[in-house]
Every structure is written in C-alpha cells, then in structure tokens.
Amino acid sequence: MTTKPQGLDHSGAHGAEPTGSVVMFTDITEEALEPLANAAKAQVMTEAMGALVVFDGIVRNHDHGSAVRGLSYSAHTQAKEYIARVVQSVADELEGVRLWAVHRVGPIAIGESALTVLAAAAHRGRAFEACEAVADRVKAQVPIWKEQELTDGSTEWVGIDT
C-alpha cells in the first residue's frame, strides 16, 4: 500500500479540483474480492471526486471457444511489487485520480471476481481512462498465470509467457 505523496491536495477543499494522483491500495490476495470492494469505495472517494469507475474481472464459464469448469491463479513471489509499480505508473501519468487495485490468486469459482480496480476522479472521462489503464497494465505486466480446468477434463495455462 502506498500513501498520499506530500504536497498534493486530494480533498478538493474550497471547491478546487483535486491535484496530483494517489494509489490508495494494491494487493495480491487469496481473499474474495467482493467484500473488499465496499471498503475500497470509501478509501478512494472524497467530496472532490465526481466519478467512480469500478472494473470487476469476473471468472466466466468459457474462454476462446472452450467450456471452463473452474480456474486457479498463481503469482510470482514479487507480484505484489509489480502490481504496486504498475498502478503507480498510471497515477504518475494521469492527474487527479485515486486508485485501488487487487488481484486474487488461488482457486476462483465461476462468477467470482479475479481482479477489481477502482478509479476515482473529479470527472468521468479521467476515471474511465485511469480504470482501463490499470486493468490493462495489470493483465499485461503483472506476473500472474491462470490455470483453467476445461469441461473436457484438460487443463490450459494462460499468461504463462508474462
């Protein structure tokens, strides 16, 4: 978890637009993400934030034409450092956002969240931009691999080239 950088005002006090950006929280966990999302909203929102975008990457029952029975995510031992750096890179590039991102590892049932990202900003365009950037970069740059159990009994690894 990172804290608010010194000298930045995220409160929007006195009607001012928030300046700077901050990563409120990042993690890799075996815990279910759904209960964490409500607390995350309270962490990222301030009175200056007029938009909150939430992305939940949900485990689905199919992938590239194959029926999926279940899956499990594995992560590199340094995945927590990677996700923190990736989310910080978005905060460094986009002014006035507050970010929260957690990826789940271990077995995850169909219909449950594997990745949750929250991005708050004064305006919706910036919040959408930040949320999409975090989700895309986490998938592309954080060393997490998915083992899918297909309904035909075979298994398939996804993201192993990360």
Located regions from the model:
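N-terminal, polar/charged subdomain of small-to-medium soluble alpha/beta proteins
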Residues: 1-114, 120-132, 136-162
